[in-house]
């Protein structure tokens, strides 16, 4: 994977979303990530690929899993990684997102990893800074590296994504993970279903190329992959479900409901999980679960993305 000999040049300076990526772009990142998995599994994991490069993780929303994954990915590539704690930063004193970005830009980082509660925040920063920007989640808009790691997990287990039936279940309305996965899975030829109470399905969801269901049994029937989503209560302005108990009864994935899917169906969850709300422990920890594999694939995907964005050929420095 060092300097990725043999891989075509990734044609984009930033990763702001799955929207705008071609199937070939997606496949390129997945192939790079496959190579990163092998590196992450060997005793000596550290590369010098990004030695001398600076990565700043700028997280305005808390995320232990994603921030740690990006940090580890950068360190495995040899980058100097700085985690900016927003809780102790100037943003708490009234500094705007753009002010913060311009301050960081003056430090001349090579890559900025951004998570923010506002949709479009990463795209806005990409217009204002002189480095590559990776969207680590912007409001309910997109979370591209999550979709890529989910695709890598599926592909390594199933061989191909084309033709698979993937059921995305839960709070689709508020989920950036759902949006990015729908875009990616459709691009690679999967048949995508979404399952949720009608209150948690976006209006016009069918126009995104998915088949909507409001009953778990119908939506899970014959599914190859079941992707569960948590209730995004922090993004809910009103009451979308009667109660947690009622929600689990109808939309929580337990062993009985899972029987509707194929026997070898994969069970996925982007985390963090709410056991007993959207998924039962017997399923989350069961033989069909690939949730821990998703975490492993996350580091590999983020290594691949950052290496692709900082490819020396982009500046004419490489072959």
From Swiss-Prot:
The keyword Transferase applies. GO terms for molecular function: amino acid binding; aspartate carbamoyltransferase activity. PROSITE patterns: CARBAMOYLTRANSFERASE (PS00097). InterPro entries: Asp/Orn_carbamoyltranf_P-bd (IPR006132), Asp/Orn_carbamoylTrfase (IPR006130), Asp/Orn_carbamoylTrfase_sf (IPR036901), Asp_carbamoyltransf (IPR002082), Asp_carbamoyltransf_Asp/Orn-bd (IPR006131). Pathway: Pyrimidine metabolism; UMP biosynthesis via de novo pathway; (S)-dihydroorotate from bicarbonate: step 2/3. L-aspartate binds at residues 93, 176, 230. It catalyses: carbamoyl phosphate + L-aspartate = N-carbamoyl-L-aspartate + phosphate + H(+). Carbamoyl phosphate binds at residues 65-66, 115, 143, 146, 271-272. Its EC number is 2.1.3.2. One of its GO terms (biological process) is 'de novo' UMP biosynthetic process. Catalyzes the condensation of carbamoyl phosphate and aspartate to form carbamoyl aspartate and inorganic phosphate, the committed step in the de novo pyrimidine nucleotide biosynthesis pathway. This is Aspartate carbamoyltransferase catalytic subunit.
